[in-house]
Amino acid sequence: MSRAQDRIGTWIGWTFFADLANALTLTFGYMFSSPVTMQYPDTEKWLPYSRYRGHHFLKRDEEGEIKCVACELCARICPCDCIEVVPYEDEKGNRHPAKFEIDTARCLFCGLCEDACPADAIALGQQYEFSSFSSADLVIGRDDLLAKPGKAATGGGVVSARLNTKKDVLVETKEMQGYNWWRNIRRT
């Protein structure tokens, strides 16, 4: 083996050793740093930003009436066809929705319904926890959409998810603990 080949081999060895040392330094640095995983839902909860597109909600006007004029533009523009609006006219001739349902199991949360609404009656809020065991529970009606909270002015952080009062704590009964949890799920 010539001297040039020996130098090249030594150089390659030191280069790989330097790369290995850099990788190990980075690995040990992350190993001893604080974790970045959020302990959801036990100890931490994420607050979405105000521009986050979560659950739908319907707005009311100054008199407390629903803002929706049942023009059905939101239902027509929806790419998932998950909005159903049935209009009716009251005695004054104003249009209102007799039925307004959104199937959130099919919804993409794209916000096109919010953009298409001429009365600014429908909007997407910040709630992201609305899972269910039944897909029928994910169909939200007009009264439920009116009762949902709107957008918060602040957001984009992590807050403690610990309960402040003991009255909200749910205690599992003896038969709900352990391996029998799946027997208590209602099947529809």
From Swiss-Prot:
Its EC number is 7.1.1.-. One of its GO terms (molecular function) is quinone binding. It is an enzyme of class 7 (translocase). [4Fe-4S] cluster 2 binds at C78, C107, C110, C113. It catalyses: a quinone + NADH + 5 H(+)(in) = a quinol + NAD(+) + 4 H(+)(out). Pfam families: Fer4_7. Its main location: membrane. PROSITE patterns: 4FE4S_FER_1 (PS00198), 4FE4S_FER_2 (PS51379). It is a peripheral membrane protein. GO terms for cellular component: plasma membrane. The keyword Ribosomal protein does not apply. NDH-1 is composed of 14 different subunits. Subunits NuoA, H, J, K, L, M, N constitute the membrane sector of the complex. NDH-1 shuttles electrons from NADH, via FMN and iron-sulfur (Fe-S) centers, to quinones in the respiratory chain. The immediate electron acceptor for the enzyme in this species is believed to be ubiquinone. Couples the redox reaction to proton translocation (for every two electrons transferred, four hydrogen ions are translocated across the cytoplasmic membrane), and thus conserves the redox energy in a proton gradient. This is NADH-quinone oxidoreductase subunit I 2. It comes from Rhizobium etli (strain ATCC 51251 / DSM 11541 / JCM 21823 / NBRC 15573 / CFN 42).
